[in-house]
Regions:
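Charge-rich, low-complexity N-terminal segments
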Residues: 2-151
Length: 151
């Protein structure tokens, strides 16, 4: 796992800025499963995250394509900023890239402490990885609309 100084400074700034902001906030990021992590750790990540997210009031959706993670999560500013920092430090994730972060008027995934699905199209997440800001959110939302997620 490697981060340049700008990424670390940006993450620190985001964390500090979101600590005391009221309302909901969201993060959308992509990362890769570390080469030395067996694919079975993904089930462990999902199970542990569901429990932890429920305690912290975080909701969201995790998509995995066999190599890439893409996740959108939402909750209080302090909680989602802390979660993003834990993900950045998690050795099972590499090449963590924040595609979007900011205030959120209404939760998108209020039904799930962590919804999880996999996709077979490995290029879908790779294409998303190149986007930032609202374009990334719109592409992610469009991808989610095409997934078979249980109600």
């Amino acid at each position: 796992m490697s981060f340049d100084i700008v990424e670390l400074a940006t993450a620190s700034y985001i964390f500090m800025a979101m600590q005391n902001k009221p309302g909901h906030h969201e993060f959308l990021y992509v990362s890769k499963l570390a080469a030395d992590s067996p694919i079975r750790v993904v089930a462990d990540i999902a199970a542990r995250s569901r429990s932890a997210n429920q305690r912290r009031g975080i909701t969201g959706l995790l998509i995995f394509d066999g190599m890439h993670f893409c996740q959108q999560f939402e909750g209080s500013g302090a909680e989602v900023a802390a979660l993003m920092e834990r993900i950045r430090q998690d050795p099972r994730h590499t090449d963590v890239a924040i595609l979007h972060q900011g205030p959120l008027a209404e939760r998108r995934f209020r039904r799930w402490s962590l919804g999880y699905t996999s996709v077979e199209d490995v290029e879908a997440l790779a294409r998303l990885e190149r986007l930032r800001g609202q374009a990334a959110v719109e592409a992610f939302t469009g991808m989610v609309a095409g997934l078979d997620l249980d109600p």
